[in-house]
Amino acid sequence: METTTEENIRIIFGLKLKKLRTDKGLSLQQLSELSKVSVSYMNEIENGKKYPKPDKINELAKALGTTYDQLVSLKINKNLTPVVQVLNLRIINDFLFETFGVDKGLLMSMMANAPTSLSALINSVFEIARNYNLQEEHFYFSCLRSYQEMNDNYFEDIEDAVEKFKADAGINQPQQLTSEQYMQLLKQHFNYRVQESDFSDFPKLRGFRSVYVKGEQPTLLYNTRLTEQQKIFLFGKELGFATMKIEKRPITTSWLKVESFDHVMNNFKGAYFAQALHINKESLIQDLEHLFAQTTWQPNLVLALLEKYNASPEMLFQRISNLLPKFFGFNELYFIRYSSKEPSKHLKEISKELHMSRNQVDLEYIINEQNYRRWITKTMVKHLDDKFHETEGTKTFVDAVISENEEKDQYLTISMLRPMPELNNNANSVTIGFVLTEAVRRKVQFLNDPTLKFEKLGNVAELHYETPYALRKKRDEEIKMAEYDRLTKELNSSVTV
């Protein structure tokens, strides 16, 4: 999680030099006269741009009343410790400095000059992160969600890339393409080798939906147990990576290891591309208009959309979440996905979550709102679970509810529950909900349907989430990565899997 580079060493040296100089009450000009080091060069040293030669370090050490060894040592006083902790975090280097181009030396200098209260705050953040076992990937996914929320979860550049690909590939979409057709597009347009595999020779990889191996001819192995809808999404995402020329992307589905924020962002772009490619924007907008025009809640219309678009509940709801803010003005919505073997009893760690809120500055409000939305998700799944077990977990169910929280905000929430026997025998739930704003009340005609369930906020403290165990997860990643490396070597040696 931590990294010390040559650049960081320069910055640490500059911070120490500046701290020693200011502690002695010396200006740059005064230290320059004492050390015979020019003001301009010293300024570059303090800003982390230059690292002085040994003779210059000796002169600076003498002028500051310290030794050469103390000056070049990476040991620092306690006031600078939080600054260097931030500097050495790989997550900060990858995300803030590399992705967004923030000037590292300037930021560190500003932090070093800040009052000690900032150091206390940084220490507190580190302590909280340790206590709650927060990992880099949590930060990356949180930043991605914020990025989606700031853009109303609609991305014109990806929509345009989809339309261009469809035109280039000659895709006219009155009918949905099959997974076989998407596979052929990968082979014909991007020279992919696509193979089905049960990963029998690689038991640690059996839980993955797919494994990608980069090479002169890219290879995509997909699990024999995937459903048609899962293959459609998988091949569509690969088409997205290839069309948008994305290099930094995950090598497995689900994630083997989260490498960087670029990987997280690019995975989202590939997934968005797949959804937009498979579910036509204009067609779905018309279908939503028809659904909202009904004066009574019609769950069968939602299930019919799954069949029409040959899509999984998650793909359908994700695509709906792209279009509602942009084309319907439903700007306060949320999306939650989780899976569990016993959905009526507990939530496993939520695997996907998006909250678009009216109040992005009141942290307490945001936390309360997100807890409430999780609570109504669990309440919805309890309703669906009874029906689910009546069919021994073989059918997909959908239901809607109007709910109210302590602030008297009302929501319309629609949730689906479906079996997932193909990989882990879990039941998978996807939920989309939106605040009953004036825009929603004007558009959705079935809100006054007396058959719609109504729920008031219950005890959100009842929610329990399984927290990840970082060490166990890291060991598991290492084992699977070794298996992936073995598979890659065999493929590159032209051994059939």
Please name every model-derived segment.
Residues 2, 11-12, 19, 29, ...:
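Short juxta-domain linker segments that transition from a proline/glycine-rich
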